[in-house]
Amino acid sequence: MSSPAEYYNSLPPISKAYGTLCFFATVLCQLQILNPPFLALYYPFVFKKFQIWRLFTSFFFLGKFSINFGIRLLMIARYGVQLEKGAFEKRTADFLWMMIFGAISLLALSAIPFLDIYFLGVPMVSMLLYVWSREYPNSQISMYGLVQLRSFYLPWAMLGLDVIFGSEILPGLLGILVGHTYYFLSVLHPLATGKNYLKTPMWVHKIVARFRIGVQANAPVRPAAANTGSGAFRGRSYRLSQ
């Protein structure tokens, strides 16, 4: 069995970096070194006081130490990592672009006055979970050892649990919306029309190459052996050349 350090070092770069930042953001807030409102997305402070960091730090706070925090962090460690190692294997730039697209979309949605979302970590994790559920739609998931369901339904099941445990439904719902938008534009629409409007920009490839982050190889990705099925429950069988 590998040690915790070996496991951590084996994680893919983007998921590892995001999970680490989320963990330390909560630790620093728990130790009262940082105040959560200091990390929150509040557009009047962004534009009037030039507190630009809020556009970034709002994605790293998953809440104070709690069961919900632990669940979200485990989602990054399990589903984000599996997504980056599997469907996005050797395509680090594409995975990073998915995260950037998700962040920009969530920032735009949170600017709508009646939404009022100040922390975007939960929506981002929900987006990752949704994309994972579309890439691996037929995996069997056990929820707390009580219920077995197809992974295709997992984002909606987690949304239901948020309601049961008294959490807000809107952050998770927006994450699902952004995840579906990404999957439609990057996978479903190109497969149907041959046109990819969400192709990873060259500057993202250059960033990955410049800092030697992960692997850049746009080879087609074969579906996982467990992903057999038909219709709406079938993951993509290939991705058009990026």
From Swiss-Prot:
InterPro entries: DER1, Rhomboid-like_sf. Keywords: Endoplasmic reticulum, Membrane, Transmembrane, Transmembrane helix. One of its GO terms (biological process) is endoplasmic reticulum unfolded protein response. The chain crosses the membrane at residues 21-41, 56-76, 95-115, 158-178. Seedling shoots and roots. It is a multi-pass membrane protein. It comes from the Eukaryota. One of its GO terms (cellular component) is endoplasmic reticulum membrane. It holds the Pfam family DER1. Residues 1-20, 77-94, 179-242 are cytoplasmic. Residues 42-55, 116-157 are lumenal. GO terms for molecular function: signal recognition particle binding. It is found in: Endoplasmic reticulum membrane. SUPFAM superfamilies: Rhomboid-like (SSF144091). Belongs to the derlin family. May be involved in the degradation process of specific misfolded endoplasmic reticulum (ER) luminal proteins. This is Derlin-1. It comes from Oryza sativa subsp. japonica. The gene is DER1.
